[in-house]
Regions:
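Rossmann-fold cofactor-recognition segment
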Residues: 379-388
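Canonical Rossmann dinucleotide-binding motif of NAD(H)/NADP(H)-dependent dehydrogenases/reductases
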Residues: 331-363
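Short, well-ordered alpha-helices that flank and scaffold nucleotide-derived cofactor binding pockets
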Residues: 45, 79, 353, 357, ...
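Generic hydrophobic, amphipathic alpha-helix propensity
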Residues: 347, 372-375, 379
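Conserved glycine-rich Rossmann-like NAD(P)H-binding loop of the short-chain dehydrogenase/reductase
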Residues: 358-375
Length: 388
């Protein structure tokens, strides 16, 4: 299949076709959407996904069991479409949603309708306590959370950047705090994410740090957490290497970075690390999606993570490996953070531009606050808010 796809391109397009190309190609409609909305994935990732799909949508949507994307799944989508020409979409177990239409607008409106119907149903049915209730009721103030994150982030970054420099991102949103403060944090985190589009960014499971936000002496508790950091990081690396060795096949690519991407800190929030700021932020956003899915799935049924072998076969799929190898080579300062004093002046901004062009993130400092704000806006517009 992979060898044939380049022969189907137009205008000598040398970009490799998506792994999902057959899934779109065999659906017999002019316009096809493939989506991963939290509300629908929450239904797709329950133990009784098929029954819930039928309960919510009746005969409007079809359903297919989990299968890795590819040619065979494309044929199954086509078969279901032809056997049931009245359906307006298909839920893929543990994966996502397909919808379609004869025109782009009708396809778009169909997608919105399906997502809204799932969200409305969940809002009506999910009236229980999320994540087994709260173990801690926001025990730390915003300034205390920031202080803990500020202490942990550079330490973790240094310890996991021995092979490749990494940049961090922190999220303390309400949905994240509800998860990291929950009674069921550790068992749910251990289940891993289900949607493959999530765990390809986040790894299959996060690292939950050993930290008690209700300790009488916060400084002493933070010192204890820091003291045990090496052991926790090494335990995750060992667990990931064991996962690789259990699941690898004869032609599997070599093991990749064994460090966690997502770090959950009780009472504090979520920290993510990746090769650059944008990738770290996106990984964080994807794990927020996973949190939303777990909350809604467990509220109406029981959340089911993807089978470990299936997850490995996606993560180390040769087609995914080929995609990684096609990515642009890192710039010379990727993963570096530069602090520039006098950053609002001509020399400071020129220095910032030079470093940004080489892949660094920059922090600007200047005694002229107004000029510094203007410089930040200018550079953010040219390079993105992620890196300035």
């Amino acid at each position: 299949m992979v060898g044939y796809l380049p022969h189907c391109t137009f205008n000598l397009n040398n970009r490799a076709a998506s792994i999902d190309t057959p899934l779109h190609a065999y659906i017999p409609y002019d316009h096809v959407d493939h989506l991963h909305p939290d509300a629908v994935i929450a239904i797709a990732c329950t133990k009784d996904s098929r029954a819930l799909t039928e309960e919510i949508f009746g005969g409007e949507l079809g359903w297919l069991p989990w299968q890795r994307p590819g040619y065979d799944l494309g044929l199954k989508l086509e078969t279901l479409c032809r056997e049931r020409p009245d359906i307006e979409g298909i839920v893929l177990e543990g994966h996502g949603l397909f919808t379609w239409g004869d025109k782009s607008k009708s396809c778009y409106l169909n997608s919105l309708d399906v997502i809204q119907k799932a969200a409305d149903w969940l809002a009506q049915k999910n009236t229980g306590v999320a994540f087994g209730g709260s173990a801690y009721d926001n025990p730390l103030s915003a300034s205390e959370r920031d202080a803990v994150a500020t202490r942990l982030m550079p330490l973790i970054r240094g310890k996991i950047s021995t092979v490749q420099r990494k940049v961090g991102h922190c999220n303390q949103s309400d949905e994240v705090l509800a998860f990291v403060n929950a009674n069921d944090l550790r068992p749910l985190a251990a289940l891993g994410t289900s949607c493959p589009d999530h765990f390809l960014r986040t790894k299959i499971r996060p690292l939950v740090l050993d930290f008690n936000p209700t300790a009488d002496d916060l400084e002493a508790e933070l010192a204890r957490c820091v003291e045990g950091l090496d052991q926790q990081l090494e335990a995750y690396r060992t667990d990931y290497a064991d996962y690789y060795n259990r699941c690898k096949r004869d032609n599997s690519p070599a093991i990749r970075d064994t460090n966690a991407v997502v770090y959950l800190v009780p009472g504090v929030g979520m920290i993510t690390f990746a090769k650059d700021k944008a990738t770290a932020r996106i990984a964080c956003e994807f794990y927020v999606n996973a949190i939303n899915v777990m909350r809604e799935a467990n509220g109406v049924s029981e959340y089911v993570g993807l089978d470990e072998q299936e997850a490995f076969d996606i993560e180390y799929w040769l087609l995914e490996e080929a995609k990684l190898r096609r990515m642009p080579k890192p710039k010379s300062l990727d993963g570096q953070v530069a602090f520039i004093t006098g950053g609002a002046g001509g020399i400071g901004k020129a220095t910032a531009r030079r470093l940004l062009n080489e892949g660094a993130c920059v922090i600007l400092a200047d005694i002229d606050t107004e000029a510094m704000v203007s410089a930040k806006q200018e550079l953010s517009a040219d390079y993105s808010q992620d890196v300035v």
